[in-house]
């Protein structure tokens, strides 16, 4: 014998749409597994969802009224009746039906939610709520207390509002880049693993995603690249933003100062005094000969204009390559060398 959907919801076969909704609301709250701990509550909750799924749809209800459960699910009556090619199968997730009806996956948050939002909760109308003295759907809260408060006398429910979701704080990662990547621009691929909501709105799955991070020419250290709402998702939150913050990698030859590039050139005392030509490497792989005809003191700076990093807002323009000289002094001198230096070097 097939299921009696009307009996499951506790309504007559001639019930109208509003009566079906009221019956489902009452029965679903009564047998929701989060509230009802009886062994058969889960199965009863599923039957209630299936009954509502059929009776709330005029086409399904019409077939059910004519052919019963078996005819509804096989596409027609057993004695040659016809209902076209329609075959009904319950989707199997009573929680999805509950979430669709009440507008949220948490069954009871909606009844105790914050009133900060000005939009009324779409699935709940206080005027439609049936509260039987012997079958209060919130009875479990009365027996065990709610937030440490004893339950007072019953009263009609007040207008309720959904809890406003709050976005999680940003998830910040350091992204180390080379000066060559800043000079040329680059794209990095970063794989992240995060939790995402399933279609039922209450369970989550883990999935990987590749984020393509475009690094533009000349971007400064500390620049932030944000991927909105790519963090973990749960039924109660807004996913966090994923933020990458640029950090310069240490370089074998150069240091960065804004759009300028600093290079330390080490020369001998002889080269510093007598002159020399120093080969200066550039960020793009070239070598520039730098003549030094004057005396070079420790800390002397020479500037090669336009050989630095691109300006972030005007990549066709570049900063400078700044050469800082260091002079390597000998560890010891022979007496003869000392005498020669005394004769030829000025006293001041």
Curated annotation (Swiss-Prot):
* GO MF: protein-folding chaperone binding; unfolded protein binding
Query: Which key words are in the record?
Result: Chaperone
Q: Name one GO biological process term.
A: negative regulation of transcription by RNA polymerase II
Keyword Chaperone assigned to the entry: answer is yes
| Induction (UniProt) | Expressed under normal conditions, its expression can further be increased after various stress treatments.
**Domain called J: residue spans:** 4-68
Q: Which GO terms describe its cellular component?
A: cytosol; nucleus
Taxonomically, which superkingdom? Eukaryota
InterPro entries (UniProt xref): DnaJ_C, DnaJ_domain, DnaJ_domain_CS, DnaJ_subfamily_B, HSP40/DnaJ_pept-bd, J_dom_sf
Taken from the record, one Pfam family name reads DnaJ_C
Protein name in UniProt: DnaJ homolog subfamily B member 5
